[in-house]
Regions:
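The conserved Walker
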Residues: 10
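Conserved glycine(s) of the Walker
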Residues: 13
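Hydrophobic positions on the alpha1 helix immediately C-terminal to the Walker A/P-loop
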Residues: 17, 21
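NTP-dependent small-molecule kinase module
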Residues: 167-202
Length: 202
């Protein structure tokens, strides 16, 4: 079975799907949000931080993600270095998050002899393309819990987040479809969509 990449905008169901796939297939789940938090704490000069500048964080973490994916997915683990790092059969991961630049990552992964990422990864995109700003705003108010960073935002602040998220869903749909991801809309019947995805991974 291939490694799995789940990319998409916030609140599209990436973490939930990753947990479901982990339960079924046993892949280790790597949260890009958590990786970003680690970089932000360990190497602040790299400007890889949560809740800061989404575009810059995505740009700055792309080299790490590309080399990580290439090193842990190439048949011999070689890549830019001229020696093998070995392979552990059955050692599989799920990488999930929003800070993904698919074009830049594909370019780096190519240096590991992976010309088409779809041959080595299940590339899954999740968006909520059918939800407008008002629907996203209502979803925040209805489903947020105290653990969500949006929970205590004012109405105006939350509406601004919903406006940004609606635009980001459209942006991610375009980027992901252009770079080989199979994109699923989780605006409606999310459980059915997840069941379809789980059946499709190989």
């Amino acid at each position: 079975m291939k490694n799995i990449v789940i990319a998409g905008a916030s609140r599209s169901g990436k973490s939930t799907l990753a947990r479901m796939l982990n339960e079924k297939y046993g892949h280790y789940v790597l949260s890009i949000d958590k990786l970003v938090a680690v970089f932000g704490s360990s190497y602040p000069s790299l400007d890889i931080r949560l809740n800061w500048n989404r575009d810059k964080t995505t740009e700055n973490i792309a080299p790490f993600l590309g080399h990580f994916m290439g090193m842990f997915s190439s048949p011999d683990g070689k890549g830019l270095q001229g020696y093998s790092h070995g392979e552990i059969p059955g050692n599989r991961f799920i990488l999930e998050g929003a800070y993904i630049d698919p074009a830049k990552i594909a370019e780096i992964v190519g240096s590991y002899g992976i010309d088409d990422m779809r041959e080595h990864f299940n590339l899954i995109g999740l968006v909520q393309k059918d939800k407008d700003v008002e629907t996203l705003y209502r979803d925040f108010r209805q489903y947020d819990t105290e653990n969500d960073w949006t929970y205590k935002l004012s109405d105006d602040e939350l509406r601004a987040v919903a406006e940004d998220l609606a635009a980001y869903n459209r942006e991610m749909y375009t980027k992901l479809t252009a770079n080989g991801f199979t994109v699923y809309d989780t605006s409606h019947d999310r459980e059915k969509v997840f069941d379809e995805i789980i059946r499709s991974v190989s």
